Amino acid sequence: FVGDTMHVIHANAASGMLEHMTQYAEGAAASVVDGEGFNVGLYTSVALDSSGHQHIAYYNSSASSLVYAKQDGTSWSVEEVDNTASVGHYPSIALDGDDLPHIAYVDESSEYLKYAHYNGAGWEIAIIDDLYSNVFDTSIAINSTGHPQIAYSISNYSSSTYEYAVRYASYDGTDWSIETAMTRAGSYTSSSLDLALNGTGVPHIVYYDDYDDDLYIAVRSGGTWSTSKVRDAAG
């Protein structure tokens, strides 16, 4: 919402285009964000800047690339961020205090967690986790110092056993550190993961465990992660 106006970003199943739907009190209006190719707007993530304009990260399946779109008044500017193989799955976008975009996303071809940041002149891209694990979802937040924090869920096959985990990657301005918030063997923790930071920067990760069909929250306090069940049968 921007004021009393609802904004929805969605892929048009018939045309394959990425569209922006605006719902006013007196009616609705739709516009095309990106129509270059079919299924251009999969896995969308949206953030609003200080002027109420929308910034979108999404996967273009026609080009197998990560794309970023920015609203400027009534028009949209669209640019390809990363096109190295099949990249851009499960993107999550957040804006810093200067309204610059930060995007976490998955490189499906190499099974990497990647991060892209627009520095005002161009995109900086980095590999954050390259443990060759399947990454199912990402969620990014910017802390009070302007540094990105990323939560993501993975599966890793080792010694004939699948291990599923929720991880947390934190950037301090120089280096990335990676912690495991939750791990277990034999379960299937997949999508539906979301990260938020409280007023003191403490991360809270809500995730859905598809194995037992329950919703959990993981909180980091004093350097230690604790998890608790939020709801049974949440699926």
What are these model-derived regions, one by one?
Residues 1-235:
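Extracellular, repeat-based ectodomains that mediate carbohydrate processing or recognition
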